[in-house]
Amino acid sequence: MNRARDELGAHMSIAGGLSLSLERGREVGCGAVQIFLKNQRQWAAKPLAADEVRQFRAARRAHAIRHVFAHSSYLINLGNPNPALWSQAVDAFTDELERAEALGLSCVVIHPGSHMGAGLEAGLARVTAALDESVARTAGYRVKVALENTAGAGNTIGRTFSELVALLERAARPERLGVCLDTCHLFAAGYDLRTPAGYRRAMAECDATVGRGRVLAFHLNDAKAPLGSGLDRHENIGRGLLGLTPFRLLLNDRRFTRVPKVLETPKEPEPSADLRNLAVLRRLRLRRRLGR
């Protein structure tokens, strides 16, 4: 398979300019690239310049990277019970959707957030209201929102498929929403993907709740922390507690062949870490894909 045309890739740095992320992706053979849209440690950022947009779109064509999407800033908590901080989060997320639309990205991945002790139901209500507001402000946009499953630590929302589907079902415009599944987070939340039976159970639950057609992206990460630990600790593919089996099963599951899958594994040493992890993943493919 032509590496520039498959659905595998990695999160890439935007240091020096958005378009450089795509050049970095090409250098390690990405067919998919995830980026931050701005410095993810800061709330404010200067508006996108028309030249930046043109350069980014030209670089994407030149490097033949099929799938490009974004991850939102980690500062954003759509479940914040504080009204002022909630409004700040909504404004920031709306800005990210606007940037993603200008760049022609497919979706923006976001952690649903934390209820910060207010309780799960209150948190779900706050996140739903935030998503509805951001989507309403970007009416007519093509870019989608991908809710990422969480590892389950503390007061985070989105640990289970049932929590994710609660957000999807309550949304005013559910057609703009989907999910991004992180393998490390699934394992940390208690989904044991290490056997074919465990993988089938998890994907069956996903299909029965969220629906496989709403899976917009995958984060492929091995795990440093034990099953059900709630700890978000990423490891290189095959070198953590998940092992290779979950990745082999996913990469040969034809239900998800066209869904982009990116690494969020340790980057050191660069770029050899990404090169190694992508090579491991590509070797796991079978000529005959598995499917149910």
Language model: regions and residue ranges:
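Active-site acidic/histidine proton-transfer and metal-coordination neighborhood
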Residues: L78-G178
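Active-site beta-loop-alpha junctions enriched in small/polar residues
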Residues: H11-A15, K38-Q40, S72-L75, G113-H115, ...
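Gly/Pro-rich active-site loop or hairpin
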Residues: I157-V165, F187-R258, S272-L275
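Acidic (Asp/Glu)-rich catalytic clusters
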Residues: N2-R3, E23-C30, L48-F69, E96-G104, ...
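Non-cysteine beta-strand/loop elements that form the S-adenosyl-L-methionine
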Residues: G31-F36, R66-A70, L177-T183, R212-K224
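N-terminal pre-domain/capping segments
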Residues: M1-S72, I76-E98, R287-R292
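Conserved, mostly hydrophobic/aromatic
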Residues: G25, H71, A89, A100, ...
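C-terminal helical cap(s) of enzyme catalytic domains, especially alpha/beta-barrels
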Residues: P271-L290
